[in-house]
């Protein structure tokens, strides 16, 4: 059972904000974590006096909603009884001088202490940080060219504010577009490159606010056809709406979308994974780890992890998802265990293991995460990897093998090896890639760029495999990059495959949109992977190629045709993550040392641990040694 401690009314010194606790809790839901969460109503609101720019505001803690007001008031606090042994803060992120609420020396301590924290210039100078608290080493003296200057102007124009504070960037802001659909919302996955661009620029406020507000939205009730998904689900996006009130007042509300309004009504599986990855990046770049140490943030991390690690019927350590649950958010035949989700899942688990505070209450989830990481890396490295030799082995597979020692474990039919793959895979044994999906009797041999890049970034693949992926990109540059980096997948589904797999989707026609379209936003992830593997020249080549066209083409969302020559037929212009991806790539190339904050090196400890239960029973020998033998240090 969840236990909460109500510490009576404590007068704020001084206070100009009201925290109103919600008591609307879903009786049918509970949290396995020991931290307390409530279920607020549909909107988070901030009431301002009309035209009053000086109205005070506060970001509510987990169970409260902010109301901007001019009156002094008291705060009723709810504190988790399972607090860590050292103080943890719940911070008012929107105030220029921050209110910090904390408990002293552990749990169940009274009275609640409220202090006003003011900025200390001496402390900032001591850690060599700017006024936002972001490390700036390596960026001084860097001048922007005309393309970068326009990109920064457009990125800043896309900023969304809530209670006069920045909370994200819209997906696209084309001044000529009269029907923005949902492109005027803040998407979690779309905001990641924007967040990194701001962090690398030394501007952390917008990222901190974004992380806290989306965390608060995590706890809201979400229902589709009278059914609620598991706790911990992050929204795909949110929109700031302004509602009129009486007496010349207005109310700003956050309206999230958990998939209820999405095309196909698909839950955004990747949103929570991206949120955890961004939270780690915030701490690594700014050096401010207090955010991830907060009780509410720790609870948010655990809720996402618990949702992903929940027991089910699956026999594999990979995450089972439906079609359209990630960047490829339309029907494209990726249901099952798509590589993109597995790579982000692995990255999020590694981030969680770094950030979760170690204590008695967290040791079980940390152990579960470590075991899953070990099993997941082994499974992907062994079963998703293909090169010329592996494809030849699959081509000669025997089928219908019923035994514990079967070579063709997934009963893959050799006829699935398409002629295009035999012609396309390089001759060199130093080139290869991770396939897009693996299920019983099914291998998706398409090359999915985001999944392969994140396998490099997170070290999901072995060092040898990671180098081989970049070798393949270099050898197949015309196919995967062409006139505009980078193909989201290769090759495109055509003819009967397009009809059957996409359902004749008019937006995903061959070599368009998600079906083989070219997406400039993938540039920053390609840059990060290249820097990690010591191949920055590949990234520079791609960035230079994109820089020649993006400004003239008005920063499109994607490009069409086999070589990415034409702007996509339904592509939005002034797409924010296209702009932000370009800026982030430029900054990473200007200061490659900072890239180490965003990727992971090989974790040898994961390779040493084996969770193979069959080994203990003696039914089968563990093949962990095979995975370890692939590693090149």
From Swiss-Prot:
Q: Which range is the signal sequence, renumbered to this chain?
A: none
InterPro entries per record: 6-hairpin_glycosidase_sf, 6hp_glycosidase-like_sf, Glyco_hydro_100
**Which gene is annotated as encoding this protein in its UniProt record?**
INVH
One GO molecular function term of this record is: beta-fructofuranosidase activity
* Top class in the EC scheme: hydrolase
Q: Where is the transit peptide?
A: 1-71
Q: Which reaction does it catalyse?
A: Hydrolysis of terminal non-reducing beta-D-fructofuranoside residues in beta-D-fructofuranosides
Family of the protein in this entry:
Belongs to the glycosyl hydrolase 100 family.
Q: What is its EC number?
A: 3.2.1.26
Predominant location category: plastid
Intracellular or extracellular location(s): Plastid, Chloroplast
Q: In which tissues is it expressed?
A: Expressed in flowers.
The UniProt keyword set, sorted, is: Carbohydrate metabolism, Chloroplast, Glycosidase, Hydrolase, Phosphoprotein, Plastid, Transit peptide
Q: What does this protein do?
A: Chloroplastic invertase that cleaves sucrose into glucose and fructose and may participate in the carbon flux between the cytosol and plastids in leaves.
Gene3D superfamilies on file: 1.50.10.10
Name the species this protein comes from: Arabidopsis thaliana
High-level lineage: Eukaryota, Viridiplantae, Streptophyta, Embryophyta, Tracheophyta
Entry keyword annotation includes Ubl conjugation: no
**Example GO BP:** carbohydrate metabolic process
Q: Which residue positions does Phosphoserine occur at?
A: 623
An example Gene Ontology CC term for this record: mitochondrion
Give the matching PANTHER family: ALKALINE_NEUTRAL INVERTASE A, CHLOROPLASTIC-RELATED, PTHR31916
Q: Name one Pfam family in it.
A: Glyco_hydro_100
Q: What is this protein called?
A: Probable alkaline/neutral invertase A, chloroplastic
């Amino acid at each position: 059972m969840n236990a909460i401690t109500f510490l009576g009314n404590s007068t704020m010194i001084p206070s100009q904000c009201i925290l109103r606790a919600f008591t609307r809790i879903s009786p049918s839901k509970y949290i396995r974590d020991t931290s307390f969460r409530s279920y607020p109503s549909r909107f988070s609101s901030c009431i301002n006096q009309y035209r009053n720019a000086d109205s005070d505001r506060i970001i509510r803690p987990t169970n409260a909603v902010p109301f901007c007001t001019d009156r002094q008031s008291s705060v009723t606090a709810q504190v988790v009884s399972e607090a860590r042994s050292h103080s943890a803060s719940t911070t008012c992120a929107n105030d220029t001088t921050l209110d910090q609420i904390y408990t002293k020396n552990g749990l169940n301590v009274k009275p609640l202490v409220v202090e006003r924290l003011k900025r200390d210039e001496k402390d900032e100078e001591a850690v060599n940080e700017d006024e936002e608290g972001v490390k700036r080493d390596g960026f001084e003296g860097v001048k922007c060219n005309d393309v970068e200057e326009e990109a920064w102007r457009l990125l800043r124009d896309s900023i969304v504010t809530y209670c006069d504070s920045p909370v994200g960037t819209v997906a696209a802001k084309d001044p000529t577009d009269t029907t923005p659909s949902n492109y005027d919302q803040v998407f979690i996955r779309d905001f990641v490159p924007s967040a990194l661009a701001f962090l690398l620029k030394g501007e952390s406020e917008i990222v901190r606010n974004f992380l806290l507000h989306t965390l608060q939205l995590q706890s809201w009730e979400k229902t589709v056809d009278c059914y609620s998904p598991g706790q911990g689900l992050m929204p795909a996006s949110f929109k700031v709406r302004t509602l009129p009130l009486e007496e010349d007042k207005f109310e700003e509300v956050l309206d999230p979308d958990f998939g209820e309004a999405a095309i196909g009504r698909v839950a955004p599986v990747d949103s929570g994974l991206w949120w955890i990855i961004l939270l780690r990046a915030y701490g690594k770049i700014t050096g401010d780890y207090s955010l991830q140490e907060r009780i509410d943030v720790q609870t948010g991390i655990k809720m996402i992890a618990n949702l992903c690690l929940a027991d089910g019927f699956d026999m594999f350590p990979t995450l089972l998802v439906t079609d359209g649950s990630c960047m490829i958010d339309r029907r494209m035949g990726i249901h099952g265990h798509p590589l993109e989700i597995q790579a982000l899942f692995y990255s999020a688990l590694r981030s969680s293991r770094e950030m979760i505070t170690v204590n008695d209450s967290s040791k079980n989830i940390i152990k579960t995460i470590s075991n899953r990481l070990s099993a997941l890396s082994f499974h992907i490295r062994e079963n998703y990897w293909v090169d010329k030799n592996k494809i030849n082995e699959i081509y000669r597979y025997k089928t219908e093998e019923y035994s514990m020692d079967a070579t063709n474990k997934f009963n893959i039919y050799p006829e699935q090896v398409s002629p295009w793959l035999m012609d396309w895979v390089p001759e060199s044994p130093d080139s290869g890639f991770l396939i897009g999906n693996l299920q019983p009797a099914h291998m998706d041999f398409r090359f999915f760029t985001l999944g392969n890049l994140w396998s490099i970034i997170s070290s999901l693949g072995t060092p040898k495999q990671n180098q081989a992926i970049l070798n393949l990109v270099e050898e197949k540059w015309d196919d995967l990059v062409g006139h505009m980096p980078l193909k989201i997948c290769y090759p495109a589904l055509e003819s009967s495959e397009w009809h059957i797999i996409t359902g004749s989707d008019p937006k995903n026609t061959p070599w368009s949109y998600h079906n083989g379209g070219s997406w400039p936003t993938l540039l920053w992830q390609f840059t990060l992977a290249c820097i990690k593997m010591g191949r920055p020249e590949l990234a520079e080549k791609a960035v230079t190629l994109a820089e020649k066209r993006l400004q003239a083409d008005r920063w499109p969302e994607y490009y069409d045709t086999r070589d990415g020559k034409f702007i996509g037929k339904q592509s939005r212009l002034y797409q924010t993550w296209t702009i932000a991806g370009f800026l982030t790539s430029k900054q990473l190339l200007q200061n490659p040392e900072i890239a180490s904050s965003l990727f992971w090196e090989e974790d040898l400890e994961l390779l040493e641990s084996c969770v193979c239960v069959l080994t203990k029973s003696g039914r089968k020998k563990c093949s962990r040694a095979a995975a370890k033998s692939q590693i090149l240090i």
